[in-house]
A protein has these predicted regions:
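Flexible "cap/lid" subdomain of the alpha/beta-hydrolase fold that forms the substrate-access gate
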Residues: 3-12, 70-106, 110-306
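Short acidic-hydrophobic surface loop/beta-edge motif
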Residues: 13-19
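A short loop-to-beta-strand scaffold at the N-terminal edge of the catalytic core in hydrolase folds
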Residues: 19-28
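Conserved HGGG/HGGXW glycine-rich cap/lid loop of the alpha/beta-hydrolase fold
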Residues: 27-75, 94, 108
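Glycine-rich phosphate-binding loop signature in dinucleotide/nucleotide-binding domains
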Residues: 30, 98-101, 337
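Short, hydrophobic alpha-helix immediately C-terminal to the catalytic nucleophile
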Residues: 49, 116-120, 327, 331
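Catalytic active-site module of serine/aspartate enzymes centered on a nucleophile-bearing elbow/loop
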Residues: 305-338
Length: 338
């Protein structure tokens, strides 16, 4: 696995371009119609490593971005530099720079809402959308004065529980917790909400993001005795190096813009994504709204949903845990576009 990973990395082309007020880093492999992939929290372009290889071999240009706040892409300090307009704008910059015309956009975790809204906002640039682990919810419209999403999440959690998205809100607090031991944090994140943690009996039920009030986020991240088969020590060290480069602040700032999302996307209320769409999730993944109710709502909200699949026993890190299944399904979806 280590040799294969190194060979794959050596075949990549790295790019750093200027646009949308920042430097944007992305990697490419292969030639053909482009598929632009957006990662989530707390990850890297590297989370798409298996799909990069599969796409290139199948005759596509795999394009994996380092999202704003991560890796070699700029990491502005200002919280409002991470709202959905900025995030979608970065993907638009990359799509335009490829100079291919409309491209396919894909996303996982936080990268999924970015991909969904990119497809909604710019159908002229994105001809199809494929997302993992976070189903499409669409614009909900501006909330009434005095009501915000953080308040609704706190109300749902109750007085005795915290919620990871709320824990991430206070600047400095979450950074101190997550950055105290980045290796331990990344090892815990990548294992605790994977399907392996439940399968191995290290947790008794899937983690839905809630935990006892007063505890730290890292207290919830059970760490394995041995890494799961889909994650090597080399993989883990790459993630640690990428996060060490920037710290967690940029990634956390995505969460600190949740309250702004309804108003920013309100002009698109009632609009639908009509391009061909694709969704895959894991049956044990409850961290980001991957519930049966959300899947059902998504199926009603997408105009041309061509693939919707929940992989039994899989957790949150779908394109790594189930690399071959995800790659095969994506290839079939892409082939259907031609």
């Amino acid at each position: 696995m280590e040799c294969q990973t190194l060979m794959m990395l050596n075949d990549l082309e790295e790019h750093v371009i200027e646009g949308n007020g920042i430097q944007i880093h992305y990697v490419t492999k292969g030639e053909g119609p482009a598929v632009v992939m957006c990662h989530g929290f707390p990850e890297s372009w590297y989370s798409w490593r298996h799909q990069i290889d599969s796409l290139a071999e199948a005759g596509y240009q795999a394009v994996a971005m380092s999202m704003r706040g991560y890796g070699k892409t700029s990491a502005p300090q200002a919280i409002d530099a991470y709202d959905i307009n900025h995030l979608v704008g970065d993907v638009v910059v990359v799509a335009n720079h490829l100079n291919q015309g409309p491209v396919v956009v894909a996303g996982h975790d936080w990268g999924a809402p970015v991909a969904w809204f990119a497809a909604l906002m710019r159908p002229d640039l994105f001809r199809a959308v494929a997302c993992l682990s976070v189903p499409y919810t669409g614009p909900i419209g501006a909330l009434p004065e005095g009501i915000d999403l953080n308040g609704l999440m706190a109300q749902a959690a109750g007085p005795d529980r915290d919620y990871y998205r709320l824990f991430f809100q206070e600047p400095g607090k979450a950074e101190a917790d997550l950055e105290a031991d980045i290796y331990k944090t990344m090892r815990g994140f990548l294992y605790a909400i994977s399907g392996d943690a439940l399968r191995n009996g290290d947790i008794s039920e899937p983690f839905d993001g809630h935990f006892p009030a007063g505890q730290a986020m890292t207290d919830q991240l059970v760490s394995p005795d041995e890494l799961p088969s889909w994650l090597t020590q080399e993989d883990l060290h790459f993630y640690v190096e990428e996060i060490t480069r920037t710290g967690f602040r940029g990634g956390l700032n995505w969460y600190r813009n949740i309250n702004r999302l309804p108003a920013i996307t309100a002009p698109f209320l009632g609009a639908t994504i009509e391009q061909p769409s694709f969704y895959m999730g894991g049956s044990t993944d409850l961290i980001a709204g991957n519930t049966p109710e959300a899947i059902s709502a998504m199926q009603q909200a997408l105009g041309d949903l061509r693939h919707c699949e929940i992989i039994e026993g899989a957790g949150h890190w779908l394109q790594q845990e189930c690399a071959s299944e995800v790659s095969a399904a994506m290839m079939a979806f892409l082939e259907g576009l031609n």
